[in-house]
């Protein structure tokens, strides 16, 4: 844990169909400790904070990595620590691969995408752009939460719907959906001090596969019992503590 005078900049990278609201409970705890925090709304998320953001036309690993690099340079950030959740973990990994000198030696992967999505699901995912947001939010939330989140389902669902309320456009949403199921962290190569934090009941990533990815990058891995993929909603206090102890 760092002291108050040496706090590094933290750059949070949200997941697909998310925006900065999804990580806000965790982010606020770090703000309260005095950390410099950046948490942009990354396309296809609508820019709810009216920030000056880079333009994203290339919804690929290189495109997203370059978007993050441009954001870092445009805001004069001094090698921020990347903290990526879900699809954000792929973006963080892509950035570490392509622009390692722009970011800190430490990198955090929350609910890391540790394995490729089955091919039959890949063909279905882009179709969600044509379904009502409330319906998709309900189905996705119901599927992704673990045991511990079930008693807070309504609260979690409200945040999920808030995050998915508005996108840049349908074309971007489809492109991002395709990106989200084409990559896994293991597709990239980088030499960073990695921290993996995942729910033990994550339905998108088997614990055994997440362990393999952590081993590849010689990273520290922590599983949160009874939590699913949405650890940022289910156990924000514990997630904050796990990140904070390794900063």
Question: Can you describe what each PLM-predicted range is?
Answer:
Residues 5-50:
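Conserved HGGG/HGGXW glycine-rich cap/lid loop of the alpha/beta-hydrolase fold
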Residues 39-81:
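Active-site loop/oxyanion-hole signature of alpha/beta-hydrolase fold enzymes
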Residues 84-92:
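Gly/Ala-rich beta-loop-alpha elbow adjacent to hydrolase catalytic centers
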Residues 118, 135-189:
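Conserved alpha/beta-hydrolase catalytic His-Asp/Glu region
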Residues 190, 196-198:
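Short beta-strand/loop motif that positions the catalytic acidic residue
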Residues 203-209:
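Conserved alpha/beta-hydrolase "acid-adjacent" motif
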Residues 227-240:
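Catalytic histidine-centered segment of alpha/beta-hydrolase-like enzymes
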